[in-house]
Amino acid sequence: MTITRRELCVLLSGVFPAIALDALPAEDNSIPSAHYAFDQLPVEVLEHAEMRRVLKGKLATGEALEVHETTLPAGGAPHATHHHLHSEMWFIREGTVELTVNGTNYRLSPGGVGFVHSNDEHGIKNVGTTPATYFVVAVGPGADA
């Protein structure tokens, strides 16, 4: 069987749009562009910390995103070291924390930034004598879970 150029063009013009549509999300339920009054965001009091959630959901490009602020008491840690699929960044606002990444400890103070890749074993704790406050930005699979 031989296909002419014309038949090929007709065939491809029907195939490529279908492929492109399959690549698009079925529904755009991404986080909308907005602004937030930080002092009006609710504070959750957890067992080992206080947390103020800023954003949680999907980006328009499909990645999961979660952003929150955590305050740890002196000596406190939100949880034991762990790992997960998404990557995380910490932006330290107040206090002194120790970020452990794959067994190596890093001390971060206000203005310090920490980052872990997907599946790196990590944990954070307040090693100071005053509360420590930091922002967490999580991006990737499961960040919005």
Predicted segments with their positions:
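Histidine-centered metal-chelating micro-motifs
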Residues: 77-79, 98, 114, 118-124
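Short acidic-glycine-tyrosine-enriched beta hairpin
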Residues: 104-118
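Conserved short histidine dyad/triad with adjacent acidic residue
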Residues: 68-83
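A short, N-terminal "cap"/entry segment at the start of jelly-roll beta-barrel domains
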Residues: 3-64, 144-145
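Residue-level recognition of conserved beta-strand positions in structured domain cores
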Residues: 69, 101-103, 126, 136
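Short, conserved beta-strand element in jelly-roll/cupin
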Residues: 71, 84-98
